[in-house]
Amino acid sequence: MSSDITGTAAWQKLRDHHAQIQSVHLRELFEKDPARGQELTVTAGDLYIDYSKHRIDRDTLGLLLELARSADLEARRDAMFAGEHINTSEDRAVLHTALRLPADASLVVDGQDVVADVHEVLDRMGDFTDRVRSGEWRGATGERIKTVVNIGIGGSDLGPVMVYRALRHYADAGISVRFISNVDPADLVRSLQGLDPATTLFIVASKTFSTLETLTNATAARRWLLGGLGLGNEAVAKHFVAVSTHADRVAEFGIDTANMFGFWDWVGGRYSVDSAIGLSVMAAIGKERFAEFLAGFHAVDEHFRTAPLEENAPVLLGLIGLWYSNFFGAESRAVLPYSNDLVRFAAYLQQLTMESNGKSVRADGTPVPTSTGEIFWGEPGTNGQHAFYQLLHQGTRLVPSDFIGFGEPTDDLPTADGTGSMHDLLMSNFFAQTKVLAFGKTAEEIAAEGTPEHLVPHKVMPGNRPSTTILAPKLTPSVIGQLIALYEHQVFVEGVVWGIDSFDQWGVELGKTQAVELQPVLTAAEEPAAQSDSSTDSLVRWYRRQRGRA
């Protein structure tokens, strides 16, 4: 059985330490240690990370690192990189880090050279996307491809759509990418609106080629394509490719298995954007930029693998997240990128973090004795400032925040008076928000400005709201890879300390099964039998009446 981390000496010391530090304000911490703004920073690849605005001191850090060592973090990290089967419930290795190993690396797992396998697929992806981007690949009517449509869900959608939007400036071949994920037909109808079937290529991303939502949408897309072209099934092979490992099902659909790109059981969906699941991204930005994307991941992988825990960005940030979850009782973390190109980053992190660490049992099947799984959410700045920052600043809930910003913009324009940069204006808001969250403004300071007495309490900014600042020179393919890897490894750190399996997702399965069972109940011509609970029974009957099926 896994040891109970809450019974370790390090956990008890942290509990005692929290009792002492919980009422200490960040103002006091900075007054006591004026250099903390320079010293409580860490660099990983191109990422400059300031964690000084957290409710920690050097004793906190020492105790958190002691906790990590009590959980055998370093050995668990090494086991993951070595390909040991750390996903115990599914008896699998966890090797998303192998997806970005350079071609001259070597990693043999279960008797297979996984690096050679990875680069064989990458080479095939590169050859295929070169043909699409150059116009060599033609549709069934002889026209070149202008739009790629990725059909997938979960990790087969969230990663590609996030990265494509982040790297839109690098889409240089005149190919746009759209994404279909939801089984709600409105998603497909909207996504196909205005497209020409003759110039559209679909990527169907499903490892088993049996995912209900994906195959439903792919079938509808095939119907749209053939109807629009006025051609038979032979046209499918010119307009559909697959990311899958199930050749029989792919061929049955009408896709040439020569255009099927596989990945492996040791890659979880939420860790797969740098695998063949990223084919749509490669089609947009090209294989050279995709290689830079992978190199960014690898840079942070190597940092995580080799840096001492005291200087290890994912370790420090993961432990700080755990500090708030388990000792301050915080339930969520806001992710606030000051880049509109990262509009889908928070949604991507929701799956990465919450599907990984939203567990109530440990790897050995025993109950987790403490809270797990931070709730991730957020929006790009400055939009969030006019929506939910009120709660961050003056609400009663503690919400640690991650601010992500860039030295150079992907776009820039003059300010309203024509004398400045809109990016500078954006970043002035960025730095102001982290400052105000940390230090706030006291009642005395507000009263001294002549504020009417009855308004003073309403205008007090309490501060002491923690945040991490993550800066990079520019949002590039390498940098987005680095950002993703930074959060991937934070997830791992928290999961190891909690003793959970961060790489399975059994909690999503029962709902799928029940949906399959309920579909004929909703659609049958005859009145259905009573459901097992009165709520579901009455809801099903309401829906049937709306659809004219009494």
From Swiss-Prot:
The keyword Isomerase appears for this protein: yes
BP term (GO), one: glucose 6-phosphate metabolic process
Keywords, alphabetical: Cytoplasm, Gluconeogenesis, Glycolysis, Isomerase
Disulphide linkage map: none
Enzyme Commission designation: 5.3.1.9
Family assignment from sequence similarity: Belongs to the GPI family.
Protein name: Glucose-6-phosphate isomerase 1
Species of provenance: Rhodococcus jostii (strain RHA1)
Organism lineage string: Bacteria, Bacillati, Actinomycetota, Actinomycetes, Mycobacteriales
Protein encoded by which gene: pgi1
